[in-house]
A protein has these predicted regions:
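Rhodanese-like catalytic fold shared by cysteine-dependent sulfurtransferases
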Residues: 1-2, 6-157
């Protein structure tokens, strides 16, 4: 069996935490989902308004995809996961088109696995609740101040 993690490298190494903890399933191989695209940077370029269409999200030619997944054995059971299942499902389809015959999507994804604290994981990092509370408090103070200023401005009219 081989485990394929298609999340970003930052999610894989635990820097981008999207569950109680960050990290990855032991032994997983990280090949980010976006690497399937002709231009893996398309999503970021769209967000930065550097481009106006998603043509770069088209799949690479089959030969390029075969090279991308050459570390994997197409005859082994392949478990694919991501954060929630969407990226894994699409990657599973790509693998099947490439001739992988035993592809499964781990439905619980990292969201379920990462929140199961007794499940083994590598590169474990934890969500910093204290920092979040501090930032939320500061944000609430700013909202309160802005509401006060708005009320005062309306009173002057």
């Amino acid at each position: 069996m081989q485990i394929l993690d298609v999340r970003t490298p930052q999610e894989f190494i635990g820097e981008d935490i999207r569950a109680i903890r960050g990290g990855h399933i032991p032994g997983a191989i990280n090949i980010p989902y976006e690497q399937n695209w002709i231009d893996p940077e398309t999503l970021g370029k769209l967000a930065r308004k550097q481009i106006t269409n998603n043509a770069g999200m088209s799949l690479k030619p089959a030969e390029d995809l075969k090279r991308l997944y050459s570390r994997l054995d197409p005859n082994k059971e392949t478990i694919v996961y991501c954060q929630s299942g969407a990226r894994a499902s699409q990657t599973a389809g790509v693998l099947q088109q490439l001739g992988f015959t035993k592809v499964k999507v781990y439905d619980s994804a990292w969201l379920g696995y990462g929140n199961t604290l007794d499940a083994p994981a590598e590169n474990v990092t934890f969500f910093n609740v204290g920092l979040l509370n501090s930032r939320l408090s500061a944000l609430q103070e700013r909202v309160n101040q802005l509401e006060k200023e708005l009320a005062e401005a309306k009173g002057r009219k």
